[in-house]
Structure formats: C-alpha cells, structure tokens
Amino acid sequence: MKKLFRRTVDTGIEHGTVTVLLGRDGYEVTTYRIDGAYEDSRHPKEVLFTNRLEEDLRRRDFTINAMAYNDEVRLVDVFGGMQDLNHHLIRCVGDPRERFSEDALRILRAVRFSAQLNFPIEEETAEAVRELAPTLENISAERIQAAVSYTHLRAHET
C-alpha cells in the first residue's frame, strides 16, 4: 500500500495496517493475515501475513463482517454472511467460544451490533456470550469504557 499511495500513516504496521490518506479522509487498509495464539483475551501473540483472502476472513468476528468484494469474483462470502445479513442475524465465524476467547471485547461488539441493527444473536453465539461474559474482567476498564462509550455514541446516530 505504501508503494501505491503517496500519503500513508503507519497506524498498526506490526499488524499490517496503514492508513491511506486521500484528500481529507483516511482509510485503514490491512494486509491479509492469520492471527497466532491469543494469550490475553484481546491480542494475538503473533501475526502472520498471507496472500489468501479466505484465511484472513476466517479470523473475523461475525459472518456479516467476513465478506469481501473484488471486481473479478464479486462477493466473497465463504461463511454465509449475506444469508445472515438477509435474516438479520448476528453469528460468529466458526466456533463462537473460540472467537470470544480470542478477544473478549467481541462479546460487547455482538451486543452492540444486536442493539444497533436490531438483529437477534444466533443461539450458539448468544450462549457463548452468556458463558464467556466473565472473561471481560480480563480487559482493562479503559478498553471496556471505550467500547461502551462507542456503543452509546453510535446508538444516538440512528
């Protein structure tokens, strides 16, 4: 990305993320990646870069966030995100316990998306939310406050 665009900011270069500046706007662009093991219920211990889109999509939180588009293939939806979007459903990619164990803040994201979009949470995903909610205690109060504040601000946008 840094070779394609003149103005970029290394916003998370260790995770393959740069912000491309176009005019007054910034767009985060992230290299396809595979997350290593999670040890703190928040961040992967290591990040491996890949050139396979499906591997990158597999690490996403919810099926509706695990879709991509390109001019050749058009919609890339290997996890049923469009079906869940059409059925107004929040569902984890793969095993919800694994997704929430990787990053406990995803629990709050599930609740936020459900409230914001008025989508129910799929039963297995909801069960994992209830089961793993105590893992939020491992997340700093500042991160939880930021997530809750973001949810509150977004609620007033609709």
Predicted features, each with a name:
Residues M1-E157:
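Catalytic cores of the polymerase beta-like nucleotidyltransferase superfamily
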